[in-house]
């Protein structure tokens, strides 16, 4: 993936550390840019400046509103992973993206290990986590419940040491709509990472790591992951959560 690397901050050393850690190489011809400002790390689509920048922000804005006034345990993702009563499963979010579903789960009390294989997305996610860790309101529970894994692929996790109750998968899937109708964030993301065409390969390592269930979020029109029929599904207006119970145990 080609990207421009732009430092608009006063901290040149921090910018270089980010580039080195994620092995990012500047390409002046790229239309996507990863930009460090004094406030945050953000992604811009230079040929569509009206789209604005994409950054990870758990502290305020949409995500803070969702934490305070959203459905909490009643949200579809919370029901899909099996949250009930005092039961708060440990979770591996194997396709973490910008961490939004993971944040919902962490906000209601689950511990979530985040895995993200795209280095640019992982850099954005880490930046958002670092800022959240420093926040006086949510910092303590974020440090305890949302951790970015050192590995970029769930197949590299140690089944004996890092298994979780639930493995959650939300692979990118092509949108049916024309790009102009897809919200800005998804348009930029599709340009950055494309569809997860190899997402079927997630299924086997996910089953190995999940003690209770694997949950796969899909658009309502998408086929089952790896052509595997789930034990049951939960549906929302536009999506479907396919649930696979581990080793035929009750979840």
UniProtKB/Swiss-Prot annotation:
S-adenosyl-L-methionine binds at residues 100-101, 116-117, 170. One of its GO terms (molecular function) is rRNA (guanine-N2-)-methyltransferase activity. Pfam families: SAM_MT. InterPro entries: 16SrRNA_methylTrfase_J, SAM-dependent_MTases_sf. It comes from the Bacteria. It catalyses: guanosine(1516) in 16S rRNA + S-adenosyl-L-methionine = N(2)-methylguanosine(1516) in 16S rRNA + S-adenosyl-L-homocysteine + H(+). It is found in: Cytoplasm. Its main location: cytoplasm. Its EC number is 2.1.1.242. The keyword Cytoplasm applies. Keywords: Cytoplasm, Methyltransferase, rRNA processing, S-adenosyl-L-methionine, Transferase. GO terms for cellular component: cytoplasm. HAMAP family: 16SrRNA_methyltr_J (MF_01523). Belongs to the methyltransferase superfamily. RsmJ family. Specifically methylates the guanosine in position 1516 of 16S rRNA. This is Ribosomal RNA small subunit methyltransferase J. It comes from Actinobacillus pleuropneumoniae serotype 3 (strain JL03). The lineage of its organism: Bacteria, Pseudomonadati, Pseudomonadota, Gammaproteobacteria, Pasteurellales.
